Amino acid sequence: MAGHDFVIKADDLSSPQTGALIALHLQGMAQNTPQEHVYALDKSGLRADNIRVWSVWDGDRIAAVGALKQLSDTQGEIKSMRAHPDFCGKGAGKLLLLHIIAQSKQDGMTRLSLETGCHPDFEPALTLYRRCGFLPGAAFGDYHAGEHNQFFHLNL
């Protein structure tokens, strides 16, 4: 994107900026979704063996964070996608989502899924997912469909 020199990095969650962006993500989930329907992971949850986290940086500033949870040899789940407010609409989230999709293909996955909320604040993310080919579909894994969540899938 013009004016930005984004770099994607594998993220071990040790950076204070990454921690702050994850905290902002969790705060947003709590504000827009009843707590019993929030499935966002905190830093300890994102450290699971089957989860990889990446972040997008513009110089020394974090622009976005996102994760890939391996559900099986062929299916993955997008987790904790969040752009920093200063970088919303600047392409960092799209760059990261495309990176996760490419990594999933490289890993031999054939399907990516995600669970997200229904509040209007989720609309920018939903637009991004749709533009990248994700389609609405059924609940997956241990999720249950309800009035506060929705599910999207991408066949790779």
Name the predicted role of every residue range.
Residues 83, 89-102, 127-131:
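Conserved acetyl-CoA-binding loop-helix of GNAT-fold acetyltransferases
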Residues 104-117:
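Conserved GNAT acetyl-CoA-binding A-motif
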Residues 73-75, 111, 149:
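A generic structural signal for beta-strand entry/edge sites
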Residues 114-125, 143-147:
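Conserved beta-strand-loop-alpha-helix junction that forms the acyl-donor binding cleft
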Residues 3-75, 79, 84, 97-98, ...:
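Acetyl-CoA-dependent GNAT
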Residues 51, 147-151:
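Short hydrophobic/aromatic beta-strand or adjacent loop that forms the aromatic wall/cage
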